[in-house]
Amino acid sequence: MSSIETYMQSVGEQARTASRAMMRATGAAKNQALLAMAEAILAQRAELQAANAKDVAAARANGLEAALLDRLTLSDRSIELMAEGLRQIAALPDPGGSITATSVRPNGMRVAQMRVPLGVIGIIYESRPNVTIDAAALCLKSGNATILRGGSEALHSNVALGRIVQAGLQAAGLPTAAVQVIDTTDRAAVGKLVTMTEHVDVIVPRGGKGLISRLAQEARVPLIKHLDGNCHVYVDAAADLAKAHDIAFNAKTYRYGVCGAMETLLVHADVAQRLLPALGQALREHGVELRGCARALQWLPEGKPADDADWATEYLGPILAVRVVDTIDEAMDHISRWGSGHTDAIVTENLSAAQRFQREVDSSSVYVNLPTCFADGFEYGLGAEIGISTNRLHARGPVGLEGLTTLKWVLNGEGQVRA
């Protein structure tokens, strides 16, 4: 066994032991740990920024692009937001131990379901060190142990944050191994983590399509994931066009880089001439490049012809594909063929069309008269999220505290025996 395998095996064993202790942890102890972490992050700001400066300097020397450097940097504001996030998670209801679906059988046996932690969660993520705190806090609050493996470019930052997390756990009388940060940049550690089925119950990858595709191929541990966010807005024949203009504009321009950004606009032929000229001009003035089908380009004079690659692409930038369709069925067929199952929306005042769209579009979130950029756990009232899942099993859509738990059956009787 290699040194990396030995190291990861030890991490996994400690996490599994800690997960059993976390099953017994009280809500008060978990909240105490979270609040201690929030105080320590602010108190140790200088130490955190010194560690982060090493990562930023190395990343800049290696030519990391400006947007990624910005994500990597722990500014005063980002540190304050991490502390505030910890306090917000501490204030959320504890999902553990809640009882649902209670019934009494004819023989008097009481049957119910209890919400319990998943166990040990591995989180694999790229350059943003704030994910270390977000992931640790959500896993802790939901009663799970977690193993965190951040990007190599943020190693010093993540290790420093990990020390703060473990000090908070210790202060609350919880096992420090409930949150462990992998302190090696060796990629073999990731390969081992996603195959340790005896110690890890689920993996949550946070990163680009390349990372998630690779993990999906290599993992033996189940993944909660989404590959990409190729999101659509369909403007129906019965749409309020003022709403449609604002929804489509917001869905594209709110933030280009989020996974809920609209990448393709589908417009019913009956309203295309009235919607597209003004909307196209507004988008162009905002710096958005338009790529359309031949029919759409009639009303988008500066647009470029779209091809199949455009329908399939998650741009994560100021580019929008536009297609004119003749029916709601054609719109839903397009989404079924080219969509990623993330988030899709219809703009319509027709109730039956709205109901059909929500019933038949097979995505993790389906909206009526809302922009797709609402795909976010905070917007759903979840308080926080570990990510967005397009899986059909277990969690789907934004994954908050409840998504990091599962249900077990609990039965109570008075000595009944089965006949």
Curated annotation (Swiss-Prot):
Lipid metabolism listed as a keyword: no
Localization annotation: Cytoplasm
A Pfam family hit: Aldedh
Record GO terms (molecular function): glutamate-5-semialdehyde dehydrogenase activity; NADP binding
Pathway(s) the chain acts in: Amino-acid biosynthesis; L-proline biosynthesis; L-glutamate 5-semialdehyde from L-glutamate: step 2/2
Major localisation: cytoplasm
Keywords for this protein: Amino-acid biosynthesis, Cytoplasm, NADP, Oxidoreductase, Proline biosynthesis
Catalysed conversion reaction: L-glutamate 5-semialdehyde + phosphate + NADP(+) = L-glutamyl 5-phosphate + NADPH + H(+)
E.C. number(s) listed in UniProt: 1.2.1.41
Keyword Transmembrane (UniProt): no
Family classification: Belongs to the gamma-glutamyl phosphate reductase family.
The name this protein goes by in its record: Gamma-glutamyl phosphate reductase
Source organism: Bordetella pertussis (strain Tohama I / ATCC BAA-589 / NCTC 13251)
